[in-house]
């Protein structure tokens, strides 16, 4: 052991130990912290999504209430040829524009989310939905507090209804960072009944690996949904007064209609059964000729999300919406299950998907985050390899020092 240099050995042990500590910090502590900060839903962010549907069918509320704004005069919307008098329905392209913004709250780990959705037919706004809720920034799940609100507006009817504060559950506009291959609970923005959002399979969207998720929202009464939310915050006396209302009055209350508008809406929701049902459907639902029916709106949808799993970014979103008239819940389910689609009973039907600009914008959001994750993984790998190498060197230096000391002890004993 004549070549042993104690000072050099000590310096090597010190340097190796420092490299090990730094390697552990860089390889195992700093990346998780960086990823945690990346996964936090940012405050002050805005997402603009534009959906398009090449073919849609919509109840022509303008012609019913305000002929001066009838989009049937536009080249993009034409009247549907139906056995009913007048231009009761339109067909043509439809647009769905959504803007989602986030803002800070008094809690660092929570963020406010505000969304505005607008359905546009023939250049005219047909429906708007504004909603506000609060999310946990690290999971993108709603907080368990009654802070969520909604406002539905139907411009052709000059009506709007505000849904009082309630507790939102399930995913809605954002997916968790590091999305898993499993089912999630999904809260549709139109009706707030939770439905399963099931993982389907891995796919590729614009060259990027993605997970495909699918949710089906069964037929739900829009009137019942709105009244349920309203009654959930009302006093017992208010609940009793709502229960005493006639179906027409409940319809008027749910949509916030004035008396004149309510009378106009009755023209497309009440009448003899043969006006709304084909002869085969009359037989299916056991209607007699001339039997009066009173219909209400039902909503159903299928949603398909394509999610980049590492960042939770929605790369594409398809939604098939069908809002139609039915007399009751049982009939609505039968219409859906047996595919008894009749344009006369259609309120709104469209198959929406992100347009190319929105897909590109979402890809531009995901790409730099994916690059940062890959860089962190590479840094972590290099740091861990360096740590292992430094540990090997440290062990070798410690063994050499121990052997040197053992040799010195033997020499002293022999002397």
Model-found features: residue ranges?
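Short N-terminal edge-element motif at the start of the domain
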Residues: 156-192
């Amino acid at each position: 052991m004549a070549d042993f240099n104690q000072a050099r050995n000590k310096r090597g042990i010190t340097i190796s130990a420092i490299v090990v500590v730094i390697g552990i910090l860089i390889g195992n502590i700093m990346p998780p912290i960086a990823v945690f900060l990346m996964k936090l839903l940012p405050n002050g962010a805005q997402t603009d999504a534009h959906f398009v549907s090449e073919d849609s069918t919509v109840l022509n509320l303008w012609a019913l209430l305000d002929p001066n704004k009838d989009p049937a005069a536009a080249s993009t919307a034409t009247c549907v040829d139906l056995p009913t008098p007048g231009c009761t329905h339109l067909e043509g392209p439809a647009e769905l524009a959504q803007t989602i913004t986030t803002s800070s709250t008094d809690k660092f780990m929570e963020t406010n989310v505000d969304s505005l959705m607008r359905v546009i037919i023939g250049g005219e706004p047909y429906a708007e939905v504004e909603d506000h809720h609060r999310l946990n920034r690290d999971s993108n799940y709603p907080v368990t507090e009654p802070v969520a609100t909604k406002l539905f507006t139907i411009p052709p009817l000059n009506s709007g209804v505000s849904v009082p504060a309630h507790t939102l559950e399930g995913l809605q506009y954002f997916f968790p960072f590091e999305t898993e291959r499993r089912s999630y609970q999904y809260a549709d923005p139109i009706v707030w009944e939770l439905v399963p959002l099931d993982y389907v399979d891995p796919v590729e969207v614009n060259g990027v690996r993605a997970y495909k998720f699918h949710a089906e929202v069964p037929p739900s009464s829009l009137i019942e949904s709105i009244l349920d939310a309203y009654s959930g915050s009302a006093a017992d006396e208010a609940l009793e007064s709502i229960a005493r209302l006639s179906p027409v009055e409940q319809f008027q209350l749910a949509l916030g209609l004035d008396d004149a508008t309510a009378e106009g809406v009755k023209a497309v929701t009440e009448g003899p059964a043969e006006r709304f049902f084909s002869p085969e459907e009359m037989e299916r639902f056991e209607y007699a000729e001339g039997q009066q029916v009173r219909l209400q709106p039902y909503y159903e949808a299928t949603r398909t999300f394509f999610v980049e799993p590492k960042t939770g970014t929605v790369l594409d979103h398809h939604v098939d919406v069908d809002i139609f008239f039915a007399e009751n819940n049982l009939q609505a389910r039968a219409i859906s299950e047996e595919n008894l689609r009749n344009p006369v009973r259609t309120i709104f039907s469209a198959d929406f998907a992100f347009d190319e600009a929105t897909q590109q914008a979402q890809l531009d959001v995901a790409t730099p985050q994916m690059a940062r994750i890959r860089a962190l993984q590479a840094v972590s790998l290099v740091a861990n390899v360096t740590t292992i190498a430094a540990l090997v060197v440290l062990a070798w230096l410690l063994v050499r020092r121990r052997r040197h000391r053992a040799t010195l002890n033997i020499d002293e004993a022999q002397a």
